[in-house]
Amino acid sequence: MPLSFTQPCSSGALLLLVVSNLLLWENVACLPLSSNDTDDDPLSIKGLLDHAMILSKNITDLNMELRRIFTISEMSAKLIDKFLSSSSSSDSYDQFMLEFLGQQELLTKNLTYCHKYSIKVPEDIEEAQNVISLEDFPILILSRMQAWNETLKNRINLSEGTPGIDDDILPIYKNIETKIAELLEDSKSILSQAYGATENVADYTLWSGLEDLQSSDEETRFLALCKLSYCLHVDIHTANFYLQFLRCVALVNSDSCLSSKTGNDS
């Protein structure tokens, strides 16, 4: 029985709502880009967006490798046995899962470790219509990369300061940190080319689970690592969606990006 963080992320449903909202936009201004920005120059808007999407894919793959390691670990097996032994029967287990998956409050509680942003992924179409504008998309990406750039530096410093702890996964975190830093620079360049702005965006709270990563309790530390991986999955999934839409608007046209075909392909 796999752990829950190996299952599809609930943020996918939220992103579908964003797509639905995009289909409702009737008048969307294109990004202020020149017609010469569609060549193979890596510093053009096309080159930056293509490179950013490659980085996003690489980060996703590395994070999936972390989750694979967590899933097959001894601690994962111990937690599964502990949970199953606490259930009096399979019926009670099934009932628990139904209740858990059906309670938005419980799902929200499990995400309290994740970064908080002033502009968040909408929870419904009505909220989406009132929250997101095209100009916000590069800022939404930038804020997430800034948050993770800081978080991963702190996470790596903790591991390096405690030899023998998480040595097997530290190289993966360092690789992710490098690619996050690259994606952060790409995001700044995209924002600069699109709107002439390059400043940092103070739009996030620090990840609140660092203390648990320092815990002497192995179970607490393991669960904190799982939550860190899940939060990264949510934000990279969100950033990748925004990159795809920005690329479509910048290199194709607004009408095509907002067509029903684009929505279905997403």
UniProtKB/Swiss-Prot annotation:
One Gene Ontology molecular-function label: hormone activity
Domain of life: Eukaryota
SS bonds (residue pairs): 114-231, 248-257
Keywords of this entry: Disulfide bond, Glycoprotein, Hormone, Secreted, Signal
GO CC terms, sorted: extracellular region
Glycosylation sites: 36, 58, 110, 149, 157
Listed InterPro entries: 4_helix_cytokine-like_core, Somatotropin/Prolactin, Somatotropin_CS
One Pfam family this sequence matches: Hormone_1
Compartments where found: Secreted
Tissue and organ distribution: Expressed specifically in the placenta. Detected only in the trophoblast giant cells.
Keyword Disulfide bond: yes
Signal peptide location: 1-30
Keyword Signal: yes
Family, similarity comment: Belongs to the somatotropin/prolactin family.
Name of the protein this chain belongs to: Prolactin-7A1
Gene, per the UniProt record: Prl7a1
